[in-house]
Amino acid sequence: MKTEQTNLSSKVCLVTGANSGIGKSTAHALAMMNATVVMVCRDRRRAEPVRDEIKSATGNQNVELMICDLSSQADIRRFAAEFISSHSRLDVLINNAGVVVRQRSLTEDGIETTFAVNHLGYFLLTNLLLDLLKQSAPSRIVNVSSAAHAYGKIDFDDLQGEKKYGGFSAYANSKLANVLFTYELARRLDGTGVAVNCLHPGTIATGLFRNLPKPIEALIKLVTFSPDKGAETSVYLASSPAVEGVTGQYFAKKRERQTSSASRNEESARRLWEVSEQMTGLPG
């Protein structure tokens, strides 16, 4: 991946889902810029070789691995407390981890898995790290969404797909939630020096869609490109001086783009925020 030669040697960057796909490429690119990179992954056995690979390839020894299961709210809380106790600053938070779940399933918290990981995981982790991000301002939050958000719908009577569930629709709904969350968070962070943006990485050749029906999976493979290419917009939003102070926007191919009309509904964004607070036990 071609990266701008920004020096991030004084910056701490956290990337979730950093052991494969876009997350791995993002972590690698930020390590090339001399950032302290904290890889947040679920499986230590799979992630340790990736951390070592990034260290070796970049010569940057400040690449750390921390373990967190983003489907578990208790584990997110444990991880956030551990991170805050071991790091005095956080300059960039990249919410990248995501899942596609073909058959409806529930987390240990009793929440539909796609919504739990792809939306509530972003929401809870970000809120728990917000004070540290504010203390480190100017800082940045980057939420990896998708153009699939345009196919999503936020049905407050069926947020968890109890009445009707499909793997792609659940994914699209969660990506719409990412955009609504980004816009609402940007409004709430106005004046704090913390910028928050979201992005469409492109359709990436990763394992994310392996749980979709075979015909759809085959079609997606025809239009995908590499994780390195897909990570470019995440890295751009995390590091580029060109977007200093830019907040509350959606990007694709490193350019601002307009999102769906549903994603720009401020009442939906506020309501989703309130419901998310209730579902994660955060104070309103």
Give the predicted meaning of each segment.
Residues 174, 198, 218-258, 264-270, ...:
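C-terminal helical subdomain
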Residues 190, 213, 239-242:
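Hydrophobic alpha-helix feature that most strongly marks membrane-spanning transmembrane helices
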